[in-house]
Curated annotation (Swiss-Prot):
Miscellaneous remark of the record: Present with 952 molecules/cell in log phase SD medium.
Assembly and oligomerization: Component of the fork protection complex (FPC) consisting of TOF1 and CSM3. Interacts with WSS1 and ESC4.
Protein name: Topoisomerase 1-associated factor 1
Compositionally biased spans, kind Basic residues: 1010-1023
Source organism per UniProt: Saccharomyces cerevisiae (strain ATCC 204508 / S288c) (Baker's yeast)
Compositionally skewed regions (Basic and acidic residues) per UniProt: 1038-1050, 1195-1205
Cellular component annotations (GO), alphabetically ordered: cytosol; nuclear replication fork; nucleus; replication fork protection complex
Compartments reported by the entry: Nucleus
GO biological process, one term: DNA replication checkpoint signaling
Main location: nucleus
One MF annotation (Gene Ontology) recorded for this entry: DNA binding
Family to which the UniProt record says this protein belongs: Belongs to the timeless family.
Length: 1238
C-alpha cells in the first residue's frame, strides 16, 4: 500500500513538472523570435504581441515555484528553452541599438522625436533585466537546501556559465550598455524627486553586474555530508560544452566592462554615494561588486617586478610573475607552470641517476629485526645509506591529508574561492586588461574608497547582529584587499597617499573589524575568523606605516593603539596562533602574519615611548577624594554628582604595557606547534613567510630565552631537511636565515646537553611545566623562592549565623568546629586533620606533664614552651600557608599561624589545657560523626574565604596593604572570593530577584546603600566605567560592601536597597495588598479619604498582630471582613480566559481558509514580488550550530526578499493598487503594484 502511495506521489510530481515545462515553453514561444520574413541576414528579433505580459508571467512562475517552494524547476525549464540567450539578450540589445540611434539623431537634430512606443519598450527592457537578475543569481547549496535544489545544482551551474559567456560575448557585451542606459534614466532625475522604485532600479542594475562577476564553475563539495564524486574529475568537467575558463575568466569580464563603460559608471556611483544617491540602496551591491572583482587577485602581481628587488621565491607563481604580461590566456599560464614542474623533475632524475652504469641494475636487501626483508633498487643505494633509507621512505604509501570538517568552506554555503588572493592561485591578466583594471582600482581608491567604506561600516554597525557569514567575509576581505593594495602602491608611487584609505583608521571601523574577529572566534566560525585575521593584520600594517610616516594627525592611530593592546584583545590575538595547527596552510599563514604584525607594532611603540593603554585597575584601599575635586569636575565637564563620582573612582586607569609580558603570551607549546607545522610545508612557502617564522624563532630562542620550547626532535629533523640538497634552493634568499639559525640553535643545544645530560631524554618528550624539575630543565637552575616577600593566604571567616546572639558559646563553638572539619573532609584533606589531631594530642601530654612538674615545684605561673607544628610526608608545609580553611581551624584551636612563608606555625604555651582538650574532643567528634548543617547546604556555605588584593604571592597589585600591617578582616577592601563586581544594573536587579525567595525563608543578608540610577550619557569620558566604590562622605559604618569579579563565579551574597525592606517580605503585607485591590474593585477604583485612613489602621493592626483584627471595620468593608481565601478565589475566577475570544478566533480562521480556497481557484497570478521565500542564493551561514542555522534561514529569506523587491519595485505601472492577501497561518499585508497593461 505504501509503495503504491509513493508511486502515486511520484507520478503526480512528474505530471506537475510536465505541465510546468509546457507552460514555460508556451511563454518562450509567445515572447518573440527571429523574423524570418525579413530580408536582413541574420533575421532581426521580433517581439510577440503579448511580450510584456509573458515576461511578467515568467517572473510570477519564478516566485510561485522557485522562491516559495524551494525548487529550481522554473530556472531549469527556462535554461532548457534558452530564453535568456535567444530572447532576453536580443531584446535588450535591440532596445539599446534603438535608444543609441535615437540619441545620436537627437544630438544632431534637437527636434528629432524618440522612436515609436518608447515607453512600452522601456517596460519590456526593465522586465528583461529583472529576469536576467533572477536567472543569473549565484546558486548556493546548504544543509537547508531541498533535494530538488541539490539535484539540479550542477546542471544549473553549467547553464549559468553559458549565460555569463553569452552576456560578455554577444555583440561585445552590449547588454551591459543596455543595463547602464536603464540606470542613466534614473540618474537624470533629481535626487529629491526619485521614488523608491527609481532607487530599486539602480540596485537592480548593480546586482546584475554583481551576478555576472560572481558566476563561477560549480563546487565539487556541496557540504560535509553530500559530496560530488571527485575521482577523475577535473575543472573541465564542471564546464558546459563550448565554454572554456578563458570565456568566463575575470580577464574577459574586465575587457567587456571596459569596452562598455561599466567602470566609469561604478566610479560615478561610488564617488557621489553620499551626495547624489540614497546610499542605503546601493552601498552593499557596490561592496559586493568590488569584493568579487578583487577576491581572486594578488595585489603584488599588479605592480612591477622592481618592487621585490633581489627576491628569489620558491613559489612557482612568484617565479613566473615577471612574465605574466606575456601570458595571453589562463591555459598558457597553466602550461608554463607544467613546463617549470617538468624541468624541476628532470633535474632531480638526472641528479639521482648513475651516469655510466645505469644499465646494470643494483639491488640492496635489508633484513629487519622481525625477519622481514626490504628491497631497494638502484646503484645509488650502494653508495650512500641515506639514499637507501630515503628510497624506503619514498616507497611508503602516502595518505592524503584529509581536510577537517571545520575547514570545509563549502559546508557553510560559501564558495571555495573566497580566499584565492591569499593562496597564490591568483588570476593573471593580459597587459592591456591589467592596465585597465589597475587604473580602475587606482581611481576607485582616490575617489570612492573612503566614502564606500564609511557607508557600509555605518550600515553594518547598526545591523551587526543580522550580518551572516558571507556579508562578514565580504566586508573584511574588501577592507583588507584595498588597504594592502594602497600600502604596496605607496611604496613605488609617490603620489599615492595613505590618507586615501584613512577611513580604515577611523574609530568605528576599528571597532567593527575587531568585534567581528572576536565574535567569530567565540562562535568558532573559522571562515570569518580567517578573514578577520587578514583584515586585522592589514590594519596593523597600516598603523605601522602611518606611524613610520610621522603623520601630524595621529589621533586615530593613538586611539587604535591604546585599545589594541588591552588585556582582552592581547588574549584573543595570542589565542589565534595556538589553534592554527589544526587548520589549513592559509589559516596558519594568517596566524603567523598577524602575530608578526602585533609584535612588530607593539615593539615599535615601546621603543619610542612608554605605551599607555586603558586597563582595569586594582581597587585602592582608600580614595582621597575631596568635595572640591567633585565640584571642580562638575563645573568643568558639566556632569551631575553621581557621574563625577563615577569618573573620580573609575575602575579603569591608564597602565603601562610591558612588551616582554605581551611577548610571553606567545611563548607556548601550541604556538610553537603551529609554526613548525607551517614550516614543514616550506616547499610551498614564500621567502617572506619563511623569514617571519625564523624571526619568531629568534624571539623565542634569544630574546625570551625560552630555549626549551625549541629543543625538539621534529625541529632538528626539519632544519636538516630544509638545508639538504633536496630542500631549499641554494639561490633562495631564505636559505641564509635557516642556515644562520640552525648553526646557533645546534651550538646552544650542544652546550645544554653537555651541561644537563638529562636533555638526552628530555628531547624525546614534551617539556615539563609548573614543577621544580621543569624549571630546572628549562632554565638550568633551581627555582629559588624569595621567602622574605611571600605572604600566606588569609584564613577563612565564618558568615553570620541566624540567631547567633541567642546561641550559647559552647553550641556556637561546636558549630564552628563542625563546619571547618567537615569542609576539610569534603575536600579530601583527611591526612591534614590526622596530623593536626596527632599534634594536639602530643601537645596536651606535654602541657599536662609540664603543669604537673611545675605545680609540684611551686611554679604554677610559668607557661610551658611553644610547640611548633610542621606537616610531614609529601604534604610539605604548603597547607599551613595556602589552605585558608585549614588556617582558620588552626586559628580557632589557638595556633599562631604564620603571615609569611619563612615564619613558623606553633601552639603557644599560653593556651589553656582545658580549652585545648575541648578542641581535641571536637575535632575527634567530627572526624567520626558527620556534621549536619542547619541550612541543608554543604558546610563550606558557612565560610567566607576572604582574600586581599595582594593575594597568594603577587607583588604588583596596589591595594594599600603592606607586609607589616595586621589583617583587617572587617575592612571592605579585603574582598571575599565568592563575590564579584556586578557588571550592570540588570545583573543587580536579577540578584535582588534571587534574594526574594531566600528572604522569605529568613536568610539574612548584608546591608548596603542604594545609589541613584546613572543617567545614560551618549558622550562619556574615555576609559569611564560604572563602579560600586564608596561615595564621598560615607562613614566607615555606611560603606557599601564591595564585590569583585573573579573567574566568572557569581556571588551568593547580595546587597539590599534598604534596611527596612524586611517588612515587605512579610506575607501579611501581601494579604493587605489583596484587601486593597478588593476594596478598589468594589468601589470602582475610588476610595474616600476617610476610608483610606481606616484602611491604614486596618493594615497596621494586621501587621502588628500577625494577621488578627480586633477593631470594627464594618464601615470600611460594608459588612463583615471577608476572608482572604474568598477574595483570592474571586480574583482567580475573574481572571479566567474569555471563551468568546476562542470562538472569535475560530470564526476568523474559518474565514481565512475560505479566502485561501478562493485564491487558489483563481488562475490569475499576482505580480507582487515582496515577501517571497528563500531561493538559497548568495550565501548562508555555517550550519555547525543552531544559531548559525537560524542565521542561515534569516539571511536566505532576506536575500529572496531583497531580490524580489528589486524586481517588483522596478515594475512600470500606469495605476497603483493595494491588495491584501492572507498567506497560510500568518496574516501578512503585502503592498502590490499592479500593471494596468497585463
Amino acid at each position: 500500500m505504501s509503495a503504491d502511495l509513493q508511486q502515486g506521489t511520484t507520478n503526480a510530481a512528474d505530471f506537475s513538472l510536465t505541465v510546468l515545462r509546457a507552460r514555460i515553453a508556451l511563454l518562450a514561444t509567445a515572447i518573440g523570435g527571429p523574423d524570418y520574413t525579413s530580408q536582413i541576414d541574420p533575421p532581426p528579433y521580433k517581439l510577440g504581441d503579448d511580450c510584456l505580459a509573458c515576461l511578467k508571467d515568467l517572473k510570477r512562475w519564478f516566485k510561485l515555484v522557485d522562491d516559495q517552494q524551494k525548487r529550481w524547476d522554473v530556472a531549469m525549464a527556462v535554461a532548457e528553452y534558452r530564453i535568456l540567450t535567444d530572447d532576453l539578450l536580443p531584446i535588450l540589445i535591440d532596445w539599446e541599438n534603438k535608444c543609441s540611434l535615437a540619441a545620436k539623431l537627437a544630438k544632431n537634430n534637437p527636434d528629432h522625436e524618440e522612436f515609436r512606443n518608447k515607453a512600452y519598450y522601456d517596460k519590456i527592457a526593465l522586465n528583461c533585466l529583472q529576469l536576467l537578475v533572477l536567472m543569473t543569481w549565484p546558486l548556493i547549496v546548504t544543509e537547508q537546501s531541498s533535494s530538488n535544489q541539490i539535484t539540479l545544482y550542477g546542471e544549473l551551474k553549467k547553464h549559468q556559465l553559458v549565460y555569463k559567456k553569452t552576456i560578455l560575448s554577444m555583440e561585445s557585451g552590449k547588454v551591459l550598455r543596455a543595463a547602464i542606459r536603464l540606470a542613466l534614466d534614473v540618474i537624470k532625475i533629481d535626487r529629491l524627486s526619485r521614488t523608491p522604485r527609481d532607487n530599486m532600479v539602480l540596485k537592480l542594475v548593480l546586482n546584475f553586474f554583481r551576478n555576472v562577476i560572481a558566476i563561477e564553475p560549480g563546487e565539487f563539495t556541496i557540504n560535509t555530508k553530500k559530496s560530488m564524486p571527485k575521482k577523475g574529475i577535473t575543472s573541465i568537467d564542471t564546464l558546459p560544452p563550448n565554454v572554456s575558463m578563458d570565456d568566463i575568466s575575470l580577464n574577459t569580464v574586465i575587457s567587456s566592462f571596459h569596452k562598455n563603460k561599466v567602470f566609469g559608471f561604478l566610479l560615478t556611483l561610488t564617488s557621489s554615494l553620499s551626495k547624489e544617491f540614497d546610499q542605503d540602496f546601493i552601498n552593499i551591491p557596490l561592496l559586493e561588486i568590488m569584493f568579487y572583482f578583487t577576491k581572486d587577485v594578488n595585489q603584488e602581481l599588479l605592480f612591477p617586478r622592481q618592487f621585490e628587488t633581489g627576491t628569489h621565491s620558491k613559489v612557482v607563481n612568484k617565479n613566473e610573475s615577471s612574465s605574466a604580461n606575456n601570458i595571453v590566456t589562463s591555459a598558457g599560464f597553466e602550461l608554463s607552470k607544467l613546463l617549470q614542474k617538468e624541468h624541476q623533475m628532470r633535474k632531480n632524475v638526472i641528479k639521482h641517476t648513475s651516469a655510466r652504469h645505469s644499465r646494470f641494475g643494483g639491488l640492496l636487501s635489508i633484513q629487519t629485526p622481525d625477519k622481514t626483508r626490504l628491497t631497494v633498487s638502484g646503484s645509488q643505494a650502494l653508495v650512500d645509506e641515506k639514499i637507501a633509507l630515503q628510497k624506503l621512505d619514498d616507497s611508503k604509501k602516502w595518505n592524503k591529508r584529509i581536510i577537517k570538517k571545520h575547514q570545509s568552506v563549502a559546508a557553510e554555503g560559501l564558495p571555495n574561492s573566497l580566499l584565492n588572493s591569499q593562496t597564490g592561485k591568483a588570476i593573471f591578466f593580459t597587459e592591456s586588461n591589467g592596465k585597465h583594471f589597475k587604473e580602475f582600482i587606482n581611481n576607485f581608491i582616490d575617489s570612492g574608497f573612503n566614502i564606500l567604506l564609511h557607508s557600509v561600516t555605518n550600515y553594518f554597525t547598526t545591523e551587526q547582529d543580522r550580518m551572516v557569514t558571507l556579508e562578514q567575509v565580504e566586508y573584511l576581505l574588501f577592507f583588507a584587499w584595498f588597504v594592502k593594495y594602497q600600502l604596496l602602491r605607496s611604496k613605488i608611487d609617490n603620489s599615492a597617499d595613505i590618507k586615501q584609505v584613512s577611513e580604515a583608521l577611523k574609530e568605528v571601523t576599528f571597532i567593527l573589524v575587531s568585534s567581528l574577529l572576536r565574535s567569530a572566534y567565540d562562535l568558532k566560525n573559522w571562515t570569518v575568523t580567517h578573514a578577520g585575521m587578514i583584515a586585522f593584520n592589514e590594519l596593523l600594517n597600516l598603523v605601522s606605516r602611518t606611524k613610520a610616516a610621522q603623520e601630524e594627525d595621529s589621533t586615530d592611530i593613538e586611539f587604535i593603539v591604546s585599545r589594541l593592546f588591552s588585556d582582552e584583545r592581547i588574549q584573543l590575538l595570542s589565542n589565534l596562533p595556538k589553534i592554527g595547527s589544526k587548520y589549513s596552510l592559509q589559516f596558519m599563514k594568517s596566524c603567523i602574519e598577524l602575530t608578526h604584525s602585533v609584535l612588530k607594532v607593539l615593539e615599535q611603540y615601546s621603543d619610542d615611548k612608554t605605551l599607555v593603554i586603558e586597563g582595569k585597575s586594582r581597587r585602592q584601599k582608600k580614595f582621597n577624594i575631596s568635595e572640591g575635586d567633585i565640584t571642580k569636575l562638575i563645573e568643568e565637564e558639566n556632569v551631575d554628582r553621581d557621574e563625577a563620582l563615577d569618573i573620580l573612582t573609575s575602575s579603569l586607569r591608564s597602565i603601562e604595557v610591558n612588551f616582554q609580558k605581551v611577548q610571553a603570551n606567545y611563548m607556548t607549546e601550541p604556538v610553537i606547534e603551529t609554526y613548525i607545522n607551517f614550516l614543514e610545508r616550506f616547499r610551498e612557502l614564500e621567502d617572506d613567510s619563511i623569514k617571519k617564522v625564523f624571526s619568531f624563532f629568534h624571539r623565542v630562542f634569544v630574546q625570551a630565552k625560552e630555549q626549551a620550547l625549541l629543543f625538539r626532535f621534529d625541529l632538528i629533523i626539519l632544519l636538516r631537511e630544509m638545508l639538504s640538497p633536496d630542500g631549499l634552493d641554494r639561490m633562495s634568499r631564505s636559505r641564509k636565515y635557516v642556515s644562520q639559525f640552525s648553526d646557533y640553535f645546534l651550538a646552544r643545544l650542544k652546550k645544554r646537553l653537555k651541561k644537563s645530560p638529562a636533555w638526552f631524554v628530555g628531547l624525546l618528550f614534551p617539556p615539563l611545566h609548573n614543577s621544580e624539575v621543569g624549571f630546572y630543565q628549562r632554565y638550568g637552575e633551581y627555582n629559588v623562592l624569595n621567602n622574605e616577600s611571600m605572604y600566606a593566604a588569609p584564613a577563612s571567616q565564618f558568615k553570620p549565623i541566624p540567631d547567633e546572639e541567642a546561641l550559647p558559646p559552647s553550641i556556637l563553638l561546636d558549630m564552628k568546629y563542625g563546619v571547618l572539619v567537615s569542609t576539610l573532609l569534603d575536600d579530601g584533606k583527611t591526612e591534614l586533620l590526622d596530623q593536626l589531631l596527632k599534634h594536639i594530642t602530643h601537645t596536651l601530654d606535654i602541657f599536662k606533664s609540664w603543669l604537673t612538674v611545675n605545680v609540684n615545684a611551686g611554679k604554677e605561673t610559668v607557661n610551658p614552651p611553644n610547640e611548633y607544628f610542621t606537616l610531614t610526608g609529601v604534604l610539605n608545609n604548603d597547607p599551613i600557608f595556602k589552605d585558608k580553611d585549614y588556617r582558620a581551624l588552626l586559628l580557632l584551636i589557638g595556633y599562631s599561624i604564620p603571615r609569611k612563608i619563612n615564619e613558623p606555625c606553633f601552639l603557644p604555651g599560653t593556651v589553656e589545657v582545658s580549652d585545648l582538650t575541648v578542641s581535641c574532643e571536637l575535632v575527634k567528634k567530627y572526624l567520626s560523626t558527620p556534621f549536619e548543617t542547619p541550612n541543608g547546604l554543604p558546610s563550606s556555605s558557612y565560610l567566607l574565604r576572604v582574600r586581599s588584593e595582594k593575594d597568594s604571592f603577587s607583588h604588583n597589585e596596589q591595594d594599600g596593604w603592606e607586609g607589616d600591617d595586621d589583617y583587617d578582616y572587617n575592612d571592605p577592601y579585603i574582598v571575599p572570593d565568592d563575590q564579584i563586581l556586578s557588571k550592570s544594573d540588570a545583573a543587580y536587579f536579577k540578584d535582588l530577584d534571587n534574594n526574594a525567595s531566600d528572604k522569605l525563608k529568613g536568610t539574612k543578608f548584608s546591608k548596603g546603600i542604594a545609589r541613584s540610577k546613572k543617567k545614560d550619557k551618549r558622550k562619556r569620558r574615555k576609559g569611564e566605567a560604572k563602579t560600586n566604590l564608596p561615595m564621598f562622605g560615607d562613614q566607615d559604618d555606611e560603606r557599601p560592601q564591595t564585590v569583585r569579579e573573579r573567574h566568572g563565579v557569581f556571588s551568593k551574597e547580595f546587597i539590599s536597597d534598604s534596611e527596612d525592606d524586611e517588612d515587605l517580605m512579610n506575607p501579611i503585607f501581601f494579604e493587605n495588598e489583596t484587601y486593597m485591590r478588593w476594596l478598589l474593585d468594589k468601589n470602582n477604583g475610588q476610595l474616600t479619604e476617610d476610608r483610606y485612613i481606616q484602611f491604614a489602621k486596618f493594615a497596621a493592626e494586621r501587621m502588628n498582630n500577625g494577621g488578627v483584627v480586633t477593631g470594627d471595620y464594618t464601615s470600611l468593608f460594608g459588612g463583615s471582613i471577608p476572608s482572604i481565601e474568598s477574595i483570592r478565589a474571586t480574583e482567580s475566577s475573574s481572571f479566567a480566559p474569555d471563551k468568546s475570544l476562542i470562538s472569535l478566533a475560530s470564526h476568523v480562521a474559518s474565514e481565512m481558509s475560505i479566502f485561501d480556497v478562493n485564491n487558489n481557484n483563481n488562475n490569475q497570478l499576482s505580480d507582487d514580488d515582496v515577501n517571497s521565500e528563500s531561493r538559497n542564493s548568495l550565501g548562508s551561514s555555517q550550519p555547525s550550530n543552531s544559531q548559525n542555522m537560524f542565521q542561515s534561514e534569516v539571511y536566505s529569506r532576506k536575500e529572496s526578499t531583497k531580490r524580489s523587491l528589486e524586481a517588483s519595485a522596478a515594475d512600470e505601472s500606469d495605476e497603483d493598487e493595494e491588495a491584501i492577501r492572507l498567506f497560510g497561518k500568518k496574516s501578512r499585508v503585502v503592498l502590490s503594484q499592479g500593471d494596468s497593461d497585463d
